[in-house]
Amino acid sequence: MGSTQSVSGTPARPLPRNKQVARVADPRSPSAGIQRTPIQVESSPQPSLPAEQLNGLKQAQDPDPRSPTLGIARTPMKISGPDPQCSLVKELSEVLETEASESISSPELALPRETPLFYDLDLSSDPQLSPEDQLLPWSQAELDPKQVFTKEEAKQSAETIAASQNSDKPSRDPETPQSSGSKRSRRKANSKVLGRSPLTILQDDNSPGTLTLRQGKRPSALSENVKDLKEGVVLGTGRFLKAGGGAREPNQDHDKENQHFALLES
């Protein structure tokens, strides 16, 4: 049919190859195609420190080489020394000290002198006055008529209250304890309106404390029959029945339950 040596018209494709696996030494690894963040082996970048601090760190680390953290850089300690104070701080402290000294030295200037002192009054003008009159010569002249009026009203109200209390005293019994007149008057008014004491409410017809005629005991037929049986009753047949129940009707010989009781004829 054709020649034994046939050549394909299309070129053959190369074998598929993964780009991620191409750089892996062993492509059979289960995690060969997974890209990972490379581990940074190099030391972390340290901030650039001035030469003075570096020298101080070296001096601090040199005396004790047995420290377990000898190569680790630490925050340098603050060198203890006299810190120069700021000029503003000095000025403020001086101002505060001066203000405090002035306030302590002159306490009388801070207090206003509104009233004249005792030794400022001219007492030599009128030697006949007493010391109280000399201290307060204007006390009687400055009394207001309103204050006098209020004092009179207070006295009148006190007198009226005392009179009302005196009028209430005779109505009370000497043996009973004292109580306010308003409470007693209220109790009396309530008793008059009700017409009976509050305890009589419990003795009404509907209360369980009182016995009515319906609740009284009545003689029952059964109790009478029991009494008759104990004393002895003559039956219709003419026989005498005793309390022991020895005699009974001939038709009740077989009845053991009713041998102690007789039949009642209605």
From Swiss-Prot:
<feature type="compositionally biased region" description="Polar residues">
    <location>
        <begin position="203"/>
        <end position="213"/>
    </location>
</feature>
<feature type="modified residue" description="Phosphothreonine">
    <location>
        <position position="37"/>
    </location>
</feature>
<feature type="modified residue" description="Phosphoserine">
    <location>
        <position position="67"/>
    </location>
</feature>
<feature type="compositionally biased region" description="Basic and acidic residues">
    <location>
        <begin position="143"/>
        <end position="156"/>
    </location>
</feature>
<feature type="region of interest" description="Disordered">
    <location>
        <begin position="1"/>
        <end position="84"/>
    </location>
</feature>
<feature type="modified residue" description="Phosphoserine">
    <location>
        <position position="207"/>
    </location>
</feature>
<feature type="modified residue" description="Phosphothreonine">
    <location>
        <position position="200"/>
    </location>
</feature>
<feature type="modified residue" description="Phosphoserine">
    <location>
        <position position="197"/>
    </location>
</feature>
<feature type="region of interest" description="Disordered">
    <location>
        <begin position="120"/>
        <end position="225"/>
    </location>
</feature>
<dbReference type="GO" id="GO:0051301">
    <property type="term" value="P:cell division"/>
</dbReference>
<feature type="modified residue" description="Phosphoserine">
    <location>
        <position position="29"/>
    </location>
</feature>
<dbReference type="InterPro" id="IPR038832">
    <property type="entry name" value="CDCA3"/>
</dbReference>
<keyword id="KW-0832">Ubl conjugation</keyword>
<comment type="subunit">
    <text>Interacts with SKP1. Part of a SCF (SKP1-cullin-F-box) protein ligase complex.</text>
</comment>
<feature type="compositionally biased region" description="Basic and acidic residues">
    <location>
        <begin position="250"/>
        <end position="259"/>
    </location>
</feature>
<feature type="region of interest" description="F-box-like">
    <location>
        <begin position="90"/>
        <end position="119"/>
    </location>
</feature>
<keyword id="KW-0597">Phosphoprotein</keyword>
<feature type="modified residue" description="Phosphoserine">
    <location>
        <position position="31"/>
    </location>
</feature>
<feature type="short sequence motif" description="KEN box">
    <location>
        <begin position="256"/>
        <end position="258"/>
    </location>
</feature>
<dbReference type="GO" id="GO:0005912">
    <property type="term" value="C:adherens junction"/>
</dbReference>
<feature type="modified residue" description="Phosphothreonine">
    <location>
        <position position="210"/>
    </location>
</feature>
<comment type="pathway">
    <text>Protein modification; protein ubiquitination.</text>
</comment>
<comment type="function">
    <text>F-box-like protein which is required for entry into mitosis. Acts by participating in E3 ligase complexes that mediate the ubiquitination and degradation of WEE1 kinase at G2/M phase.</text>
</comment>
<protein>
    <recommendedName>
        <fullName>Cell division cycle-associated protein 3</fullName>
    </recommendedName>
</protein>
<dbReference type="GO" id="GO:0016567">
    <property type="term" value="P:protein ubiquitination"/>
</dbReference>
<keyword id="KW-0132">Cell division</keyword>
<feature type="compositionally biased region" description="Polar residues">
    <location>
        <begin position="32"/>
        <end position="46"/>
    </location>
</feature>
<keyword id="KW-0963">Cytoplasm</keyword>
<keyword id="KW-0131">Cell cycle</keyword>
<keyword id="KW-0498">Mitosis</keyword>
<keyword id="KW-0833">Ubl conjugation pathway</keyword>
<feature type="compositionally biased region" description="Polar residues">
    <location>
        <begin position="157"/>
        <end position="168"/>
    </location>
</feature>
<feature type="modified residue" description="Phosphothreonine">
    <location>
        <position position="75"/>
    </location>
</feature>
<feature type="modified residue" description="Phosphoserine">
    <location>
        <position position="93"/>
    </location>
</feature>
<feature type="modified residue" description="Phosphoserine">
    <location>
        <position position="44"/>
    </location>
</feature>
<feature type="region of interest" description="Disordered">
    <location>
        <begin position="242"/>
        <end position="266"/>
    </location>
</feature>
<dbReference type="GO" id="GO:0005829">
    <property type="term" value="C:cytosol"/>
</dbReference>
